[in-house]
Structure formats: C-alpha cells, structure tokens
C-alpha cells in the first residue's frame, strides 16, 4: 500500500500551486459609500465617544455660525425632546438651499450629507477660521449615524426642509418626527420652500435622533455636551445660549446647564463655570491676561491668540479650550499656559522680601504655583493639530514653544503692576505652603538617612559622562530619567525633551542579565554600575525611593523584538535590585509608535498594523490631503515632534507601569536567574502544548 504523502507533488511542481489556488477577483472587494462606512465603523470618524462627539459637532457648528458678527446671528437654542432627539438651532445665515449644478445636490445635502465638504476647504474666508469643525466630516458623520435627521433652514423669506433617513437624504411621509415613517431616498432633491409669516427669519435648525444600533456601547452624556456648549458660548462674545428641556428621557440633566446664558463673556466667567462644574472653590482674586504670537503649521508661520484667567485656589482646577473646544486631555496650549504662568509667578516670588521665608529657606517653585492654581485658558489657533476627531487634546508642539514664553511675559507684566501686589502675595504664600508640604518628604528626613544608606551605593559616586541631566532632580521634583536604546535615541531625546525635568542615559545594546547576581558581580557590568550611580538611591535592602534623584524612570526602547529584549532585561534588573522603586510606582515602559500616519498637519500614532490600517482609513475619510505612512525603525529615526508627542509629553504619551507580581516570581527566577536546565524544561513544556496541526509548515 503506497504512502499517501507520496502522492503530494513537490512544492516546485506546477500542480502544487494550481491545487492550492483560491479565487480572488475584483468582485471579492467590498466597496462602501461614506454613509455605509461611517455606520459600520463610526469610531473612525467620531472617536470612541461616538454619540457625544457627534452631537458636539452639531453644537459646535451652530455656535461657530453665530459667533461671527458678519453672519447676522446671536443665539443658539438647544432643545431636549421627550423622544430622545435633540434640536440645535441658530439664527445665523441659514445653510445654502440652492442646487449645485455640478453635483445636483442642494446646499444642505452638500453640507450635512457629504463627507469632506465645507467652506473651510475653499477660497472662502471660512478656510482660515479658528472654529471647531475643520475636518469636514464631523457633522456629516453625525447625520450618517442617525436614525432620522431633519434640517430646517429659514432664509430669503422662506422655510426649507431636508430630511435624512439612516444617513441618506430624502423625504419622510407625515408631519411627525418619526424615524420609522415611510421614507423615500432622493439624493438630488430640489428644495422649494414655503413662505414665512415673518420674512426676516433666518437660521438653521438640526433635529437629530441617533440610531441605537450603530453604537450600542456609547451613551449620550447630555450634561457634558451642554457644559461644553456653555463654555463655548462664554468664549464667543455676543453669543447667547438657550436650553429647553421638554422631558429628556435620559439621566437627570444638571440644573446649572439648563440655565440660559447672555454674558458676560471671557475666560473670567468661563473659570466660574468650570470650577462650579468641578465642585472646586472659585478663586477670589485673579489674573486676567492675554497675548498673541505665531507658531509653525503646514501653511508656514501662523498667527494665534490666547487669553486666560487664573487665581490662587486649592485644589487646583484647570480648564483648557482651543478654538472653543474643551480639551480634557490638555495638550500644547495647556502645557504652555501652566508653564508660562507658574514660571513668571515663581520668578516674581523669588524677589519678594515679605514672603515669610525661614532662614536659608527657598521660595516656592513653578510646580508649587501650578499646584495651587485655578486656571481657564482659551486659545485660538488656525490649522491646529488635534489628537483625533474627538479633539480631546492639542498636539501642536510648536504652539507650546511659541505660547509659553508669551504667557510668561504677559504674566510678568501683570505681576509687576502695583495694583496686583496683594494678589501676587496671597498666591505666593499659598504656593509656599504647598512647597513646604512637598519638601517635607524629601528634606531633612531624607538627608538624615543618606549617611546610613550610603554603604549600599558603592564607592564610585560620580555620574557617567553620557548622562544628559535635567535642571530639576530629587524626589518630589517631578524629574524623569529615560533609559534609552543607544546614542541615536539619545540624540532624538536631546532635541525633543524638556530639559527642566527630563534626563536621559543611553544604553550600549542589551543590558546584561544580572538577576540574582551578587552585588559585586553586578557592579562589574558597566551598564548596571552607571544606572546605580545615576539613581543614587541604593540597591536591594538599601534601596530607598526617597533618595532617588528622579520621580519616574522610563525605559525607552525601539518598537521591535530587540527593544522588547532590552525592556525585559531592565525590568528584571529593577525587580531584583530596585524593587522598592517598582513598588512605589516609579518605573515605566514607554510605548513608542511603530507607525506614524500623516495627512497634512494631522498625525495618528499607531502601535501595530491594525491600528495603522484604521488610521489610514480615518484620514482618507476625513482629509482630502495625501495620506502617508511612516514606519519607525528606531527611536533615533523619529523626528523631535513625534518623539515629544508619543514618548516624552507626560500628557499624551502611552506608558505601562511596571508592577511586581508575586505569582510570577518563580517563573521569573526560572527564566532569568535559575540554571539553564530550568529554561530548557520550560521551553520543552510550552512546545509540547502547541497545536502544530494549526501551523502551515509546508
């Protein structure tokens, strides 16, 4: 009887390939239109918080419309209906209702029923707007994921109605707002309009009911949306906001956001709103400052302006807005505001004689002012880079670099005004109290222990010459040490870091495995010896987190297998020799992106191929610019902006905290510290449990 395997032709035989051929033709490719794609993958255009982002896009458009005095409007009315739908109405110009001779679409369908459409992509003056919606997709995406949307436009003495069913334009039967009413699709509907009793009426009203099947895991937080609308109104002089509750069926709406707003406008009243919403005290005395400058975008030098209100308060409260958008993730504008404000106040406090300092006591530092400050900042910056369509943070590093010194100059001038002397004194004394509390854990107590712990530090206490030091250091300073992969990565860190609090040291290749080594044997390894001298906190039983020169130690390695090996060796070293630092939450692994997907100034950072593919799809859907994919072969090849945004910026980077796990201690010892026989046994055991039948070994 012949062996069945002998009947299989060799791989080089033509029959081998013919028998394994799979039909794959153009018919196998599924093509989706914009509505289908958005309904299938809503997070691509609207982020993870799908429903809140979608409704905010509609509200942003309305407020932006009436914020321009040339548009003839002043009021936005938000109505919460009992059926769960929301209406957003403005008394601005009213969307165009005529028909585009090229596409056959009317102006409403072009604006709210078409992705990547809007006046901001044209030569129209709206193209240089600092409004919230600049991607040309958000409001349309909101319509796409709705069960029904009715758009009513009043202009030219008439009222026009355009409906959308499940994202497509057309006509519903009946006069009630019923998403289940019979619907006829019509992409090229010509709007006739009916005469208004009041011919002077003008504006746009959008009533939208989201389709619950599209984003079942997303919930609409109407209180947060209304809070953002109130904030945007306060930053838009002349804009009035009215909220009407007709029996909202969701969670109870906070009464404060149901109140109408008719001024005053500015960051002063904005700070009141945000402190009240956060339940934190309102500062009784305040600094109100503003400024302007230029930062770098894809258009070249681009003007921006900012304004902020801040005052002494505990606990600290910060509220950051850019182009009227609330950015809970902060970003460049918030970093610049806090840095400029706190540094200017700290410099002023350093020259005060009546602060009440003890002999040889240092005054409060910038971080101490930041800890006792309530602040609201509003920045207007055309072409600003957002972290995503959800716009939770600003990622334009050049804005930070240009804005921080301008804030510092303005605050310095304000603080030098004799009329503000009492406010500066109060602020400085509150910051001094914060400084004393901060230093209590690191001052005399830490120094008193240093002598008894010194025997654990070795004899060579000089710092390695390749260490890139930070100006700040010591426990409680906020200083960070990056252990990076090689000199090339060090060069990138040097160009991108904030030298005030970020230090770096390059590792020569993979650090040695010193797990379980006697201390004298470990110190014979150059990398171990250098790290011990840099940290200055002792090792093993003598390791004291309070003596460490840095509050955080971060491993920065390439996003490849070699980088993973380096991180593994460092984690092993720290679990053995610096376990108290790990237990104190001071040790982290950075997650640099493997890919950067770009379209103009917008960038999305991706950890793997699946994130890359999703980002490419998102940018192609939201931008008419060419999409580029950059693969980062190593940290040294990243540009400074990307490195800052993804590895260095404390507000935007992704890091993983190293945590001790007692349940894995035995396995860790086997893999890193035990005899080779244990590792061979472990690998054989794992291999025996692999289902080889699922592997293609041909």
Curated annotation (Swiss-Prot):
The gene is topoN. Its EC number is 5.6.2.2. It is an enzyme of class 5 (isomerase). It catalyses: ATP-dependent breakage, passage and rejoining of double-stranded DNA. Inhibited by quinolone antibiotic ciprofloxacin and coumarin antibiotic novobiocin, but at much higher concentrations than is usual for DNA gyrase/topoisomerase. Residues 479-593 form the Toprim domain. GO terms for molecular function: ATP binding; DNA binding; DNA negative supercoiling activity. InterPro entries: DNA_gyrase_B_C, HATPase_C_sf, Ribosomal_Su5_D2-typ_SF, Ribsml_uS5_D2-typ_fold_subgr, Topo_IIA, Topo_IIA-like_dom_sf, Topo_IIA_B_C, Topo_IIA_bsu_dom2. A complex of TopoN and TopoM, possibly a heterotetramer. Keywords: ATP-binding, Isomerase, Isopeptide bond, Nucleotide-binding, Topoisomerase, Ubl conjugation. Belongs to the type II topoisomerase family. Its cofactor is Mg(2+). Gene3D superfamilies: 3.30.230.10, 3.40.50.670, Histidine kinase-like ATPase, C-terminal domain (3.30.565.10). Catalyzes the relaxation of negatively supercoiled DNA in the presence of ATP or dATP but not other nucleotides. Individual subunits have no activity. Not able to negatively supercoil DNA, it can however introduce positive supercoils in DNA. Relaxes positive supercoils in an ATP-dependent manner. Catenates and decatenates DNA. Generates dsDNA breaks in the presence of the quinolone antibiotic ciprofloxacin, showing it is a topoisomerase. There is a cross-link at residue 429 (Isoglutamyl lysine isopeptide (Lys-Gln) (interchain with Q-Cter in protein Pup)). This is Topoisomerase subunit TopoN. It comes from the Bacteria. GO terms for biological process: DNA topological change. Residues 443-473 are annotated as: Disordered. It comes from Mycolicibacterium smegmatis (strain ATCC 700084 / mc(2)155) (Mycobacterium smegmatis). Maximal DNA relaxation at 5.0 mM MgCl(2).
